[in-house]
């Protein structure tokens, strides 16, 4: 296991630890109503989306789909991970999303209903993306088999990108699905929008999964609305004061280790677990200095934008100094949350060749336009690829250009 020098916690970490119990206070006490209201809000903020409330399905209005013959892309899972995945329903991303209750997979019948009744009839196939958790794999898998029995052409891609639980402990279950799943959705949604066939969409989706590594860290476990305050206290005490948990899952699953360190020390440990090829238990993807990568810094939910920016800065600095890696694209924000968790996830995607030709590289697909409320409005590919001046003009240069004033002090 990767190790690092231990430091005293920085003031920011102390502040978050002291206020973590505030996460047990919520505006809504009924979790079922909270889920339905949140799903309905998507139809308010995205007029092209519809809600099947009985089955908790958000789907695109058929009249909003310009090419109904294209492959449909469906994802889903438990609620509480907003904006993933209902917030990704829209042009260039998902055709539909099937939601469960908080941190619980939707039922197989919900999935079957979505595949049979909530997608364009002319679609040349359906790509279903499920995160690698037992309930999701089981229920989405059963829903897919039911749809196939009805004559639907369906492919299932299971997304697992976590390195927090190594091979020895994960066994045949494999890696848990984390924020890297958002990149799988983005790539597959862009391919489907370009009219690529189902087999190639599924092939590239699995290619993305195979080249993803993600790792989370959190200062506290989250409290689910509707559950007792005592449970929140127990969760907090389980972690212990002054500690950050590395490898914590998005459903409060325990991590791989608890450390007392500052941000640079934490990032050093995390990147080592993600990229160290000598760690045979976690070396899932070989990434060399010559490889192109994309970086996603994902917010669990309650890390401030200020602190998330500082985390991004530290990760990029250490990637360059320690590994000789410079991300071709960087996305920062909340894509796959964990309610109000005070944590973050680092996801790194190795930009390998899709073998689909011009305009269909992973970089092209990440850059492709998307029209959904949950996908961040990023700067353009042109902005990323333009070479700019390395540094601003020195202050002294401006001073020399400024004419002296004739004003005199009295």
Task: Spell out what each predicted region is.
Residues 4-410:
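N-terminal loops that bind phosphate or other acidic moieties
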């Amino acid at each position: 296991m990767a190790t690092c020098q231990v430091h005293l916690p920085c003031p920011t970490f102390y502040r978050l630890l002291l206020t973590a119990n505030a996460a047990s206070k919520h505006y809504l006490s009924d979790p079922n109503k909270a889920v339905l209201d949140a799903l309905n809000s998507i139809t308010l903020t995205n007029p092209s989306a519809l809600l099947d409330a009985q089955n908790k399905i958000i789907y695109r209005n058929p009249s909003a789909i310009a090419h109904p013959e294209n492959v449909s892309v469906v994802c889903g899972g438990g609620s509480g991970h907003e904006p993933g995945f209902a917030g990704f329903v829209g042009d260039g991303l998902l055709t539909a999303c099937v939601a469960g209750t908080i941190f619980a997979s939707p039922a197989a019948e919900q999935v079957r209903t979505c595949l049979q009744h909530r997608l364009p009839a002319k679609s040349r196939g359906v790509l279903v993306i499920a995160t690698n958790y037992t309930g999701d794999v089981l229920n989405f898998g059963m829903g897919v088999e039911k749809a196939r029995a009805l004559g639907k052409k369906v492919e299932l891609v299971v997304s697992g990108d976590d390195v927090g639980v190594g091979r020895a402990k994960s066994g045949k279950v494999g890696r848990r699905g984390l924020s890297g799943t958002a990149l799988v959705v983005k790539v597959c949604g862009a391919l489907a929008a370009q009219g690529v066939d189902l087999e190639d969409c599924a092939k590239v989706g699995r290619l993305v999964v195979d080249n993803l590594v993600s790792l989370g860290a959190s200062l506290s476990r989250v409290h689910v609305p509707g559950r007792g305050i005592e449970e929140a206290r127990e969760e907090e005490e389980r972690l212990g004061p002054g500690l950050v948990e590395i490898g914590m899952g998005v459903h409060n699953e325990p991590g791989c280790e608890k450390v007392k360190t500052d941000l640079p020390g934490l990032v050093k440990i995390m990147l080592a677990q993600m990229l160290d090829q000598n760690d045979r238990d976690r070396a899932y993807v070989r990434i060399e200095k010559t490889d192109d990568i994309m970086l996603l810094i994902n917010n669990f939910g309650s890390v401030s934008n200020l602190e998330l920016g500082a985390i991004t800065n530290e990760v990029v600095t250490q990637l360059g100094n320690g590994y000789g890696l410079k991300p071709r694209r960087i996305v920062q924000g909340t894509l796959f949350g964990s309610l109000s968790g005070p944590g973050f996830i680092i996801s790194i995607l190795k930009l390998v060749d899709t073998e689909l030709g011009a305009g269909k590289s992973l970089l092209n697909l990440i850059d492709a336009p998307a029209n959904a409320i949950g996908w961040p409005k990023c700067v353009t590919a042109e902005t990323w690829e333009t070479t700019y001046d390395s540094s601003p003009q020195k202050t002294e240069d401006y001073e020399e250009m400024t004419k002296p004033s004739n004003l005199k002090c009295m």
